[in-house]
Structure formats: structure tokens, C-alpha cells
């Protein structure tokens, strides 16, 4: 029996209940920036390249359905990066995320359109020290659908915080990515077990269509 099978057997009946979609979803596009998709860049992650390709269709459908779309990016203030606190000490590679650096620009295939909300953050969670939770509550949102990167970092942190803010949390498997499959799969397993539902893109799109009426 593999380690993955052993973990699933161990968790069965204790973790992994389904939460499902509520009545009003929002699509949260987390940190789809070119630093993750540019070969040779320090943050380059092939899994994110694949996620962008899949997320483009999900984003197009959400727009057609009138679903609220929120984009996040990471932005710091050079030269001292004081707004990055301890995180930029732990991960100095994040110092690329400054205004004007091409690596900090949105990936074109999933870039925000005029009128869509863009929130800049300095830490992993899209909810930490941002107006995201009040925005979603004000719009009556009860379900947060997550796409973006990286699975083991900002996706996981945002999924946990989404649940803690009272939202049904849905992570779209094909639309999130990481630099290696091991942390990607491990974190999807954890999220699906404890914090939300990990679903296929097909299932997510079907639910968005259904809820759009």
C-alpha cells in the first residue's frame, strides 16, 4: 500500500466531508503573475503554466455567468521592503514583486478586465490585511472558488482563511499549480480533507452554470 493510500485510509470516516457550493460564488484568481510562468525566472513553476491554461476557460465562464471575479497580486515597496516584514526575509525571491517589474505583471491569458477587483497583498493569504472578506460579505457571497498559485503557499493559506471567514471553499484542481508535484498534491490532499472541497474544472464550471440560472 502506498503512502497516499495509507493516508486516505487513515483519514476515511474522520476527515474529508463534502461542503459543496452555496448559492452565490465568487471566483478568486490568486497571484497569476508572470514570475511563475517565465522560464528561467526564480519563481518559475511548470505547474502554474498548466494552471493558467486551464484557468483561462474557468475565468471566461465566470465572466459569462456574471460571477464576481477578484484578482490578487503581490506588491512590495522598494528599496527596503518593510511592508514584506519577515516573509521577504524568509523568501527574498519575493522582492521581484514590485511595480514595473515584468515578473510582477499578470499573465495575459488571465489578466483582469476593466471593472474587475484587483487586491494587492503582501503575505500568503488573500484575506490577510486586505479588504477581501468585507468585500465578499457585502456582495452576499457564500462560496469562494480558488484558482492560482502556488498550491502549497498562497492557495493553501487563502483556502484556510476563506473557511475561517465563513465561506464554503472550493479549489479547482486543474487551475492551481506549484513548482513540484509533491507539495502540490500534499496540499490539495490537506485542503480537501480539512478546509474545503477540491473539485475538477468540469465540476466547477458545471456548478457556476447551474447557479447562474
UniProtKB/Swiss-Prot annotation:
<dbReference type="GO" id="GO:1901848">
    <property type="term" value="P:nicotinate catabolic process"/>
</dbReference>
<comment type="pathway">
    <text>Cofactor degradation; nicotinate degradation.</text>
</comment>
<dbReference type="GO" id="GO:0016811">
    <property type="term" value="F:hydrolase activity, acting on carbon-nitrogen (but not peptide) bonds, in linear amides"/>
</dbReference>
<comment type="function">
    <text>Maleamate amidase that transforms maleamate into maleate and ammonia in the aerobic nicotinate degradation pathway.</text>
</comment>
<dbReference type="InterPro" id="IPR050272">
    <property type="entry name" value="Isochorismatase-like_hydrls"/>
</dbReference>
<keyword id="KW-0058">Aromatic hydrocarbons catabolism</keyword>
<dbReference type="Pfam" id="PF00857">
    <property type="entry name" value="Isochorismatase"/>
</dbReference>
<dbReference type="InterPro" id="IPR036380">
    <property type="entry name" value="Isochorismatase-like_sf"/>
</dbReference>
<dbReference type="InterPro" id="IPR000868">
    <property type="entry name" value="Isochorismatase-like_dom"/>
</dbReference>
<keyword id="KW-0378">Hydrolase</keyword>
<comment type="similarity">
    <text>Belongs to the isochorismatase family.</text>
</comment>
<protein>
    <recommendedName>
        <fullName>Maleamate amidohydrolase</fullName>
        <ecNumber>3.5.1.107</ecNumber>
    </recommendedName>
</protein>
<feature type="active site" description="Nucleophile">
    <location>
        <position position="154"/>
    </location>
</feature>
Amino acid at each position: 500500500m502506498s503512502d497516499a493510500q495509507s493516508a486516505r485510509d487513515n483519514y476515511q470516516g474522520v476527515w474529508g466531508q463534502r461542503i459543496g457550493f452555496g448559492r452565490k460564488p465568487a471566483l478568486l484568481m490568486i497571484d497569476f503573475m508572470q514570475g511563475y510562468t517565465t522560464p528561467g525566472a526564480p519563481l518559475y513553476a511548470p505547474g502554474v503554466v498548466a494552471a493558467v491554461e486551464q484557468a483561462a476557460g474557468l475565468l471566461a465562464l465566470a465572466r459569462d455567468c456574471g460571477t464576481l471575479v477578484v484578482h490578487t497580486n503581490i506588491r512590495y515597496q522598494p528599496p527596503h521592503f518593510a511592508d514584506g516584514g519577515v516573509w521577504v526575509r524568509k523568501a527574498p525571491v519575493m522582492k521581484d514583486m514590485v511595480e514595473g517589474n515584468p515578473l510582477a505583471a499578470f499573465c495575459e491569458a488571465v489578466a483582469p478586465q476593466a471593472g474587475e477587483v484587483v487586491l494587492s497583498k503582501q503575505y500568503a493569504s488573500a484575506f490577510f490585511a486586505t479588504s477581501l472578506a468585507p468585500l465578499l460579505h457585502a456582495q452576499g457571497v457564500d462560496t469562494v472558488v480558488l484558482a492560482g498559485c502556488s498550491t502549497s503557499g498562497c492557495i493553501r493559506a487563502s483556502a484556510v482563511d476563506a473557511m475561517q471567514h465563513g465561506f464554503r471553499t472550493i479549489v479547482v484542481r486543474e487551475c492551481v499549480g506549484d513548482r513540484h508535484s509533491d507539495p502540490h498534491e500534499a496540499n490539495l490532499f490537506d485542503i480537501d480533507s480539512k478546509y474545503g472541497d477540491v473539485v475538477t474544472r468540469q465540476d466547477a464550471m458545471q456548478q457556476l452554470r447551474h447557479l447562474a440560472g
